[in-house]
């Protein structure tokens, strides 16, 4: 395969990924039409991307303004205290387990970041009380590794995962107070 073919394949992979991120429920024919290739080529590329771990799953994008759950962000600033062996073995980053036992939250993302904070945890909870319970338990279980915690509630999600979440009228009303 020459450089032109590799670049063309890479471009097609990007187009397919973009279409899947917009709407992963599109059928292969529709994706193929939008990307300028056959459904069979789309299927082959999707299978390849799945095998390479580029596509790790398919998920529904839920509009938080239409559910009973609220979105929260927990900012975590670490101390310089290195993790001990027990912490390394039990930290729930690489496997599907809870950060703390028995809390009524659903973890969305755990992100290691560069900046004023070291970690960002995003999650949903029924209300601020459940979010604060999670916040308090995180501090209780990991306190020797935490310099600062900050809990933020998402008041109005304008856009998430590329989709507009708030109704136009609500956005207009909200921007008046900004």
Question: Model-predicted segments: where are they?
Answer:
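A compositional/biophysical signature of low hydrophobicity enriched in polar/charged and small residues
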Residues: 1-178
């Amino acid at each position: 395969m020459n450089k032109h073919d590799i670049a063309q394949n890479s471009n097609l992979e990007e187009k397919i990924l973009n279409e899947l991120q917009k709407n992963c429920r599109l059928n292969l024919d529709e994706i193929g039409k939008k990307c300028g290739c056959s459904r069979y080529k789309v299927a082959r590329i999707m299978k390849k991307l799945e095998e390479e771990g580029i596509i790790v799953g398919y998920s529904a994008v839920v509009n938080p303004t239409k559910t009973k759950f609220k979105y929260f962000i927990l900012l975590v600033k670490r101390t310089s205290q290195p993790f001990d062996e027990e912490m390394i073995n039990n930290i729930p980053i690489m496997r599907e387990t809870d950060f703390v036992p028995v809390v009524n939250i659903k973890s969305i993302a755990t992100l290691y970041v560069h900046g004023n904070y070291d970690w960002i945890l995003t999650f949903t909870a029924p209300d601020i009380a459940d979010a604060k319970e999670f916040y308090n338990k995180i501090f209780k279980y990991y306190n020797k590794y935490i310099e600062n915690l900050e809990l933020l509630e998402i008041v109005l999600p304008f856009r998430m995962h590329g989709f507009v979440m708030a109704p136009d009228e609500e956005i207009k009303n909200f921007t008046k107070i900004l």
